[in-house]
Swiss-Prot record:
The active site is at 51. GO terms for biological process: fatty acid biosynthetic process; lipid A biosynthetic process. It is an enzyme of class 4 (lyase). This is 3-hydroxyacyl-[acyl-carrier-protein] dehydratase FabZ.
Length: 150
């Protein structure tokens, strides 16, 4: 088990910022293998304003985005760019997305991603999001990496 990674360190691993950062903390990872992170879901999330008034539910596509961000963190922890460069991960595809549980304010979403394969600049991962021991969402994710100048 590795030390946890807080939000300030996450900001060095992802380009996302408020209101679109969907990973609050990494609680465990092993480079080139897996990563476990959490997203604390609060009523303050801007998407709850319209999804849905009086019955706030986290949109499924944002659960997928949270998994994609977790996979980007794992990829960035797993290899280093050249001096003066950084990696940007583009969401390139998704397969087998399934939604099993609604996510509401007060839930803590546990994001688990596992590296399935990596070839050159393409990363394949399987992601699952849980609330407690209940599976909320799962998907197979594909991302493409581009090395960009800082």
């Amino acid at each position: 088990m590795n030390e946890s990674i807080d939000i300030n360190q996450i900001f060095t691993l992802l380009p996302h910022r408020y209101p679109f950062i969907l990973v609050d903390r990494v609680i465990d990872y092993k480079v080139m293998e897996y990563l476990i992170a959490i997203k604390n879901v609060t009523i303050n999330e801007n998407f709850f304003t319209g999804h849905f008034p009086g019955n706030p539910i986290m949109p499924g596509v944002l659960m997928l985005e949270a998994l994609a961000q977790a996979s980007g963190i794992l990829a960035n922890l797993s290899r280093q760019p050249k001096e003066g460069y950084e990696f940007l991960h583009y969401f390139a595809g998704i397969d087998n997305a399934r939604f099993k549980q609604v996510v509401i304010p007060g839930d803590q979403l546990r994001l688990e991603v596992r590296l399935v394969g990596q070839k050159r600049d393409f990363w394949r991962m399987h992601g699952e999001a849980y609330i407690g021991d209940k599976l909320a969402c799962s998907a197979d994710l594909l991302s493409a990496t581009k090395e960009i100048k800082k």
